[in-house]
């Protein structure tokens, strides 16, 4: 019997953890054949935009910042970048679920609704939206299910 591929939507903060750390990238790489990791394209753009500021705040060298940007491009081999054509029709439903929280996160919620999948995040804004959320500290439970 073949096992059904799991799907999970990644928030931008997970992409940041994957490019600046080791554990998150390793978790994704280890599970790439069992889990379809995906994220809205806006998350890749958000990470690329904020990475220089994050690097400066963390005193990360320019060379390491460039390595992180290269890793971000490598992630596209592991994490599918999904276009708004897939989830755009769920925008209003997503905004209704987010409520007065961070409305910029609508694409992540809409993609999760479109794919009927959970979200991997460290952001509290997704809790209470009616979508299962996983944090890095317990994501391996999701992988094992």
Which ranges hold each PLM region?
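Short, well-structured N-terminal submotif of metal-dependent ribonuclease cores
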Residues: 1-41
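Acidic, PIN/NYN-like endoribonuclease modules and their adjacent C-terminal/linker elements
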Residues: 2, 38-39, 113-145
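Acidic active-site catalytic centers that drive phospho-/nucleotidyl reactions
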Residues: 11, 105, 123
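Alpha-helix capping/helix-boundary segments
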Residues: 14-15, 43, 108, 125-126
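Residue-level signal for well-ordered alpha-helical positions
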Residues: 21-22, 50, 132
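Glycine-rich, phosphate-binding/catalytic loops in enzymes
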Residues: 25-28, 55, 136-138
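PIN-domain endoribonuclease scaffold, especially VapC-family toxins
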Residues: 33, 41-93
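Active-site neighborhoods of divalent-metal-dependent phosphate/nucleic-acid chemistry enzymes
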Residues: 80-118
């Amino acid at each position: 019997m073949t096992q059904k591929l799991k799907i999970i939507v990644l928030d931008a903060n997970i992409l940041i953890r994957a490019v600046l750390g080791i554990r998150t990238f390793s978790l994704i790489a280890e599970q790439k054949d069992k889990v379809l990791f995906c994220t809205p394209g806006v998350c890749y753009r958000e990470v690329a935009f904020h990475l220089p500021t994050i690097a400066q705040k963390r005193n990360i060298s320019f060379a390491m910042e460039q390595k992180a940007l290269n890793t971000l491009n490598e992630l596209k081999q592991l994490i599918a970048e999904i276009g708004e054509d897939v989830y755009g029709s769920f925008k209003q439903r997503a905004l209704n679920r987010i409520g007065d929280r961070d409305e910029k996160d609508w694409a992540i919620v809409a993609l999760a609704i479109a794919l009927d999948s959970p979200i991997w995040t460290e952001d509290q804004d997704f809790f209470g939206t009616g979508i299962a959320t996983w944090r890095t500290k317990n994501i391996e439970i999701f992988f094992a299910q």
